[in-house]
């Protein structure tokens, strides 16, 4: 099996927008909840693999490398399990530009998937909190998790937007490459 050309990937991504835009509410919503959970699992695994390293200035860079190496497992679960992730579904714009789906179908998908992703992530966050995992390392994992959350929610809008664009660019690139593989 050979890898797809750029044109073939473009066509496949465009065609994939059709079932995403026409999928039933409950199917889409459940797949979106699962995607949010998978990304949260990836984030939790990333934090657990790196919290000792990122909490020490001497090993902070290595900790970020470990974290960045583990986190994509969440996206792999999304792609391999066929779940619906808002960031990857931004590629649906290609289907709109090719006139294969309507803007309204794309926007419907985005709203349902965004809400479902949020619920899935909250569900995993609640499970992790209830499980006691945040007490790992004498509570250091919880402290690092809170510090990360505070730093992300304290960003001004401009920085948060630019970081979001950069993140989404990489997610879409990963989905694009997986489509071509």
Give, region by region, the residue ranges found by the protein language model:
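Alpha-helical transmembrane segments and their helix-helix packing motifs
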Residues: 1-181
